[in-house]
């Protein structure tokens, strides 16, 4: 009998990278593995994707873990560096870095490095989070081209705010700003992440940066799943029944007695709870799979246990397998039921959840 376990399907991960190459055949792939590869395991994910052209991370520590784990492909620091003292390490490890503000640019100009750094100038085209404003961008770009510590040519990167919406005027405006600035400049270009890859083929350019879709999860909020785009779920959150109980009509279950049975039935108790990262907000009716059969959660999610209504004729027994999301039950459905985004669901699992990798 197993308690909370994440099963990561390496074959599905490799399939998804190939599928994304089919969707963006002229672009190179930055496989985004920040936040422990969206909960899938940083090193194991990178090692499963030797055909990725580069890897994208949010923190220098993540990049260093990749290098220490034997990953030699280019690694892009998507948020840039946070401290000028990190520049010698970035140079020595041949990391690529975003540069998005005056402080970073000044640090590059003042640094003493053995080798120049590959830079991606971040242009704020409308996300208004990181990046150089368009009216300041030409002067900023010129300084990068003159900086001895910057490997030439300077590359240009931006990020969509609403790429998960088809036919979005804001995205069209961002794309126009990006195209205007990049015109005539020799560096590589990248603006498309998961939503851009799926919905905005005109944004693919030299590099694309698949994040959540690489793991088989749709970035869209339209009830689509990764399968709608030819991708397969990589993560399955699994557990087991630890008890099966007879339950009488009119009896409540769990804290607060929020669910009362309308029939005699059999209840299963699953070794899973918010202590594992499963959302406490999951309402009664949220589906799980028991022996491949969909059954509803009943009552409140507790720290360590969830109750499910197996039905009056159920033959399930303690030790039988349970899938909370993944193969056969898309995490996007759980996100819709719980009002917790799929991004958060897959990255919030706690350290007591075991990790298992299969091919």
From Swiss-Prot:
Keywords: Cell shape, Cell wall biogenesis/degradation, Isomerase, Peptidoglycan synthesis, Pyridoxal phosphate. Belongs to the alanine racemase family. The modification N6-(pyridoxal phosphate)lysine is found at residue 34. PROSITE patterns: ALANINE_RACEMASE (PS00395). InterPro entries: Ala_racemase (IPR000821), Ala_racemase/Decarboxylase_C (IPR009006), Ala_racemase_C (IPR011079), Ala_racemase_N (IPR001608), Ala_racemase_pyridoxalP-BS (IPR020622), PLP-binding_barrel (IPR029066). GO terms for biological process: cell wall organization; D-alanine biosynthetic process; peptidoglycan biosynthetic process; regulation of cell shape. NCBIfam families: alr (TIGR00492). Its cofactor is pyridoxal 5'-phosphate. The active site is at 34 (proton acceptor), 255 (proton acceptor). Substrate binds at residues 129, 303. GO terms for molecular function: alanine racemase activity; pyridoxal phosphate binding. The lineage of its organism: Bacteria, Pseudomonadati, Pseudomonadota, Gammaproteobacteria, Enterobacterales. This is Alanine racemase, biosynthetic. PANTHER family: ALANINE RACEMASE (PTHR30511), ALANINE RACEMASE, BIOSYNTHETIC (PTHR30511:SF4). It comes from Escherichia coli O157:H7. CDD domains: PLPDE_III_AR_proteobact. Pathway: Amino-acid biosynthesis; D-alanine biosynthesis; D-alanine from L-alanine: step 1/1; Cell wall biogenesis; peptidoglycan biosynthesis. The keyword Ligase does not apply. Catalyzes the interconversion of L-alanine and D-alanine. Provides the D-alanine required for cell wall biosynthesis. GO terms for cellular component: cytosol. Its EC number is 5.1.1.1. It catalyses: L-alanine = D-alanine.
């Amino acid at each position: 009998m197993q308690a909370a376990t994440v099963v990561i399907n390496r074959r599905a991960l490799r399939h998804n990278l190939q599928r994304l190459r089919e969707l963006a055949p002229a672009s190179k792939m930055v496989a985004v593995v920040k936040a422990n590869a969206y909960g899938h395991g940083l090193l194991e994910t990178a090692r499963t994707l030797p055909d990725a052209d580069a890897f994208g991370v949010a923190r220098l520590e993540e990049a260093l873990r990749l290098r220490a784990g034997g990953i030699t492909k280019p690694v892009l620091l998507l948020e840039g560096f946070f401290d000028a003292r990190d520049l010698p390490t970035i140079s020595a490890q041949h990391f690529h870095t975003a540069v998005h503000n005056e402080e970073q640019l000044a640090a590059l100009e003042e640094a003493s490095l053995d080798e120049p750094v590959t830079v991606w100038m971040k242009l704020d085209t409308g996300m208004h989070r990181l990046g150089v404003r368009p009216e300041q961008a030409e002067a900023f770009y010129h300084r990068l081209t003159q900086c001895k510590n910057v490997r030439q040519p300077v590359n240009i990167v931006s990020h969509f705010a609403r790429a998960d919406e088809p036919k979005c005027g804001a995205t069209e405006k961002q794309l126009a700003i990006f195209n205007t600035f990049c015109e005539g400049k020799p560096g590589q270009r990248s603006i498309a992440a998961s939503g851009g890859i799926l919905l905005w083929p005109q944004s693919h350019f030299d590099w694309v940066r698949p994040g959540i879709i690489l793991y088989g999860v749709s970035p869209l909020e339209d009830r689509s799943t990764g399968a709608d785009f030819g991708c397969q779920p990589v993560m399955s959150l699994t557990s087991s029944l630890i008890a099966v109980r007879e339950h009488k009509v009119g009896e409540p279950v769990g804290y607060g007695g929020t669910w009362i049975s309308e029939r005699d039935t059999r209840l299963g108790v699953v070794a899973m709870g918010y202590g594992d990262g499963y959302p406490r907000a999951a309402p009664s009716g949220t589906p799980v799979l028991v022996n491949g059969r969909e059954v509803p959660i009943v009552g409140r999610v507790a720290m360590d246990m969830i109750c499910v209504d197996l039905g009056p004729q159920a033959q399930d027994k303690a030790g039988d397998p349970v899938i909370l999301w993944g193969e056969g039950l898309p995490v996007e459905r759980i996100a819709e039921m719980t009002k917790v985004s799929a991004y958060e669901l897959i990255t919030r699992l706690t350290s007591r959840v075991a990790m298992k990798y299969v091919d």
